[in-house]
A protein has these predicted regions:
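Conserved class I S-adenosyl-L-methionine
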Residues: 74-83, 208-236
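A short glycine-rich, Lys/Arg-flanked "PGG" loop and its adjoining helix->strand segment in the class I
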Residues: 191-206
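Class I SAM-dependent methyltransferase SAM/SAH-binding core
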Residues: 78, 87-167
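A short acidic, Gly/Pro-enriched loop at the edge of an enzyme's catalytic core
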Residues: 166-178
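Substrate-binding/catalytic lobe of Class I Rossmann-like enzymes that use SAM or dcSAM, i.e.
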Residues: 222, 234-323
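N-terminal auxiliary segments of SAM/dcSAM-dependent transferases
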Residues: 1-35
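Class I SAM-dependent transferase core
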Residues: 23-68
Length: 333
């Protein structure tokens, strides 16, 4: 079972949300996504009437990002916050000419991508791999990973860089695409991420970001404890349990647009797709709760699923009320 020495750790990680806290949270909770989707995409997905599972929705979101990014004309793609690198493998399988650099601060997840790359080179569609968890979750897990790639033989070499999003170790004007697929909400300070991205992106390059956002929520941005506590209290009344279980910063769209503009980006397109993200995902979980609950209980204490379920209900409610949304943002340099 996925136990902690201190059960309060996830709450502390979520409240502080420092870089190492985010790593610890993902190492501890990424299994929930794996159990729910039977895969390692680590995104909410993009749903429509033809999609029946979270995995299909996650592939759909990756396809949407490929279209918005115009990846078919790209050369070098920097995938910032690449997680387990599964979206990058998918894009590479679609477009063999892409040079994709997977960058993440989470070394454990990068190692998973390296291991997966080795298995895909052998053209095995289903394999078992072992990934060692962090010291905060002293357990290794093994699971089946099914990679249904369009052209498996194309999913060959990806590059991996263990670095932070606010200090990108690349030369100026060195890539023509930057993608942050459901990762930028964790980057602090986010304005530094935008400035670094603008620096390494070449002239006329395309920057695409997909992330959860909130509507009409004032945020205090001073880096002191008092301001952080005031902000947390104000958010609690709107977000409820999501204040703690939504393990990221809570940005509104105007704030994001302002910081991107200050960094030198020209906004080209904004898609608000919240109704195609939160509500169908919530519906899927509610309809399949008993099965998912049993699977989760094998790896996590009972309270984890209870918190997850309450968070799912709250997420659905706030999406219907348009308090939360999901933005796909395209910009150029």
């Amino acid at each position: 079972m996925n136990l902690l020495q201190n059960p309060l750790d996830p709450i502390l990680w979520t409240v502080r949300r420092h870089e190492q806290d985010v790593i610890n949270l993902y190492n501890y909770l990424s299994g929930l996504m794996r159990i729910s989707t039977k895969d390692y995409f680590l995104n909410f997905g993009y749903w429509n009437e033809e999609i029946n599972s979270p995995r299909e929705a996650q592939l759909s979101l990756c396809s949407l990002i490929a279209d918005v990014s115009n990846l078919y004309s790209a050369r070098t793609v920097l995938d910032i916050g690449s997680g387990f690198s599964v979206p990058a493998f998918y894009w590479k399988s679609l477009i063999n000419s892409l040079n994709i650099i997977c960058l993440d601060v989470n070394l454990r997840q990068l190692k998973f991508g390296v291991s997966l790359q080795g298995h895909l080179k052998d053209k095995k569609k289903k394999t078992t791999m072992t990934v060692h968890s962090s010291k905060d979750n002293a357990q290794e897990f093994s699971s089946s990973f099914e990679a249904e790639l369009v052209n498996l033989e194309r999913a060959e070499k990806l590059s991996y860089v263990n670095a932070t999003s606010t200090a990108l170790p690349f030369a100026d004007n060195s890539v023509d695409r930057i993608i942050a697929l459901e990762s930028a909400q964790h980057f602090r300070p986010i304005n530094e991420f935008f400035m670094q991205s603008n620096r390494v992106l070449e002239k006329n390059g395309i920057f695409v970001m997909a992330m959860p956002i909130i509507h009409d929520q004032e945020r205090l941005r001073r880096n002191d404890i008092y301001s952080g506590m005031i902000s947390l209290v104000s958010l609690f009344f709107k977000l409820g349990i999501l204040t703690f279980s939504w393990m990221s910063e809570h940005y509104n769209l105007d704030f994001i647009k302002s910081k991107m503009g200050n960094a030198g980006f020209q906004l080209e397109e904004i898609k608000l797709i919240g109704p195609h993200v939160y509500e169908p995902l919530s519906k899927y979980y509610i309809q399949n709760r008993e099965k998912l609950k049993q699977a989760i209980s094998k790896e996590y204490p009972p309270y984890v699923e209870k918190v997850l379920y309450k968070s799912i209900l709250k997420m659905n409610e706030l999406s219907e009320e348009r308090v939360i949304d999901y933005a796909v943002i395209k910009a150029t340099k």
